[in-house]
Swiss-Prot record:
Origin: domain of life: Eukaryota
UniProt record similarity statement: Belongs to the NKAP family.
Listed Basic and acidic residues bias regions: 1-22, 40-89, 342-351, 368-383
Protein's organism: Dictyostelium discoideum (Social amoeba)
Alphabetized InterPro entries for the sequence: NKAP, NKAP_C
Protein name: NKAP family protein
Basic residues bias: start-end ranges: 23-39, 262-273, 292-322, 352-367
One Gene Ontology cellular component: nucleus
Disordered: annotated span: 1-128, 149-220, 239-401
Recorded GO MF terms: chromatin binding; mRNA binding; rRNA binding; snoRNA binding; snRNA binding
Length: 510
């Protein structure tokens, strides 16, 4: 049993099990599941046919692959036999042609090497040459000289080919050496005048590794000192600033002395500030005092605002209490006049009286102003005559109910109302693709011959006509209903007027 048959049987078994499970599930369900099972069975049959075609294609692929394998295995054997026979034939034909030449004295033989060992192109060329030689030799008796010339040409061609092959082999053999020489020349040109420096570096490195010494041949100095001298002697300036050099011993001592003197001065200033509290403080103290003064000023401003507000409230309260205080003060003054005589009053009492009289006059003047102001503020308003509740509506007006479905069915929500707005304004209803244009522009386009729907959109055009006719019919029905209502109202009004006239005539007659 081959692998192809095994794969085919496995696929068939898996399909059968899957079909059996699906069939058992579909039987357990109701009528709705049966319809589903039918569609599934259709899909299953389709997949089965697809798998069959796939399996047949797979078999053809496997057959082709096996055929190619067998062919490739036998190809080498066939090529070997063919080449061997070809070499044998060429060798035999070359020897016979050489013997037939006679006069030339040269035998053109082919090497008895296998086809794999010799170059295929060279062998083909040699075979063609041998065939040409035999043809030229056996044309006629006069063709002997021609055949000899042809042989000479063939010799020259062989020599040229051999010389070219030899040159190519020499180039391949010598390519590595030539490349090496080229690299060496480049290195020489690159170093140029710096060869002395390079040699010195190499020598110095060798000395360092051999002797294990840190010093080199930089004029008896270290490498770092030598580089430092080069930097100092250099005329070019660096873009970046040099890092500051560390201070020397004398400079360090001067810095320490300055630091100690500053410390002593700060101690003396502290003592002076403690003894003389009124003396000016340092810059930092002055800054802090300024900030404190600013804070105090802001606080004082806030306090002033609060005091002003309190004074306003007190003035209002004093104005209200002045009504009662004036009457009390009048009674006190009358009592004092009766008790004391004019002769017993001293100058001090006279002065105090003058002050009191001035205060009273001011208070009365203020009270008069307030009374005038209060009279203008507290005028009695006349009550307006309230309308009867029966004549006016109370509360918000009810929202007008939109009759849903009055335009017919098969319409998008809000679509019929939008179309109805255009109908009320006696405008053309815009179609699909006409949103950016006005109704006048669309009408002008249609008059010139442009049609927005076209022959491909007949169904869409039919839907549009149906919707528009629904809206038109609904609007016409509404208009008819309004006319009927108006006519009905007119009739009722006429009847009422006739009844009133009859009643009035009867009353006048009585």
């Amino acid at each position: 049993m081959s692998h192809r048959e095994r794969d085919r049987d496995r696929d068939r078994d898996s399909d059968r099990d899957r079909d059996r499970n699906r069939y058992s599930r579909s039987r357990s369900r109701g009528s709705r599941s049966r319809s589903r099972s039918r569609s599934r069975s259709r899909d299953r049959n389709r997949n089965r046919d697809y798998n069959k075609d796939r399996s047949s294609n797979r078999d053809s692929y496997y057959n082709d692959r096996d055929y190619k394998k067998d062919r490739s295995s036998n190809r080498d054997r066939d090529y070997y036999d063919r080449d061997r026979n070809r070499d044998y034939k060429n060798s035999s034909s070359g020897s016979s042609s050489g013997g037939g030449g006679g006069g030339s004295g040269e035998n053109y033989t082919v090497k008895s090497s296998s086809y794999r060992e010799s170059n295929s192109n060279n062998s083909k060329v040699e075979i063609q040459k041998q065939e040409n030689i035999s043809k030229d030799y056996f044309i006629d008796n006069k063709g002997v000289n021609n055949s000899i010339e042809r042989k000479d040409n063939i010799k020259n061609e062989n020599n040229n080919n051999n010389s070219f092959d030899n040159r190519k082999a020499e180039f391949n053999n010598n390519s590595y050496g030539e490349k090496k020489e080229f690299d060496n020349n480049n290195n020489r040109n690159y170093h140029g005048g710096n060869s002395r420096y390079v040699n010195n570096n190499n020598n110095n490195n060798n000395n360092n590794y051999n002797n294990n010494n840190n010093k080199s041949n930089y004029n008896g100095t270290d490498f770092f000192e030598y580089r430092k001298k080069l930097r100092e002697e250099a005329t070019c300036f660096s873009v970046y600033e040099r890092s500051p050099s560390p201070p020397k011993k004398g400079e360090l001592e001067e810095i320490d002395d300055q630091f100690l003197s500053n410390k002593k001065k700060s101690k003396k200033s502290r003592r002076k500030s403690s003894s003389n509290s009124d003396s000016s403080s340092s810059d930092s103290d002055s800054d802090s005092s300024r900030s404190r003064e600013k804070r105090k000023k802001s606080k004082s401003r806030k306090d002033k605002k609060k005091r002003k507000e309190k004074k306003k409230h007190q003035r209002k309260s004093s104005k209200r209490s002045s009504k009662y205080s004036d009457s009390d003060s009048d009674s006190d003054s009358s009592f004092s006049d009766s008790d004391y005589s004019d002769s017993d009053r001293s100058d001090s009492e006279g002065r105090s009286r003058k002050k009191r009289s001035k205060k009273r006059s001011k208070k009365r003047h203020d009270h008069h102003k307030e009374s005038v102001h209060d009279a203008s503020m507290w005028e009695e308003k006349v009550e307006q005559q309230t309308q009867t509740l029966s004549n006016r509506d109370i509360g918000p007006k009810p929202i007008s109910e939109v009759q849903v479905g009055s335009y017919g069915g098969a319409m998008m929500p809000g679509e019929a109302e939008a179309i109805a707005q255009f109908v009320k304004e006696n405008k053309r209803i815009p179609r699909r693709g006409e949103v950016g244009l006005t109704s006048e522009q669309i009408a002008s386009f249609e008059e010139t011959g442009y049609v927005m729907s076209g022959s491909r959109h007949r169904r869409m055009n039919a839907v549009r006509i149906r919707k528009e006719s629904q809206v038109y019919s609904a609007e016409e029905q509404k208009a008819l209903a309004m006319l009927n209502r108006e006519e009905k109202a007119k009739r009722e009004n006429r009847l009422l007027a006739d009844f009133r006239d009859l009643i009035n005539t009867k009353l006048q007659a009585d």
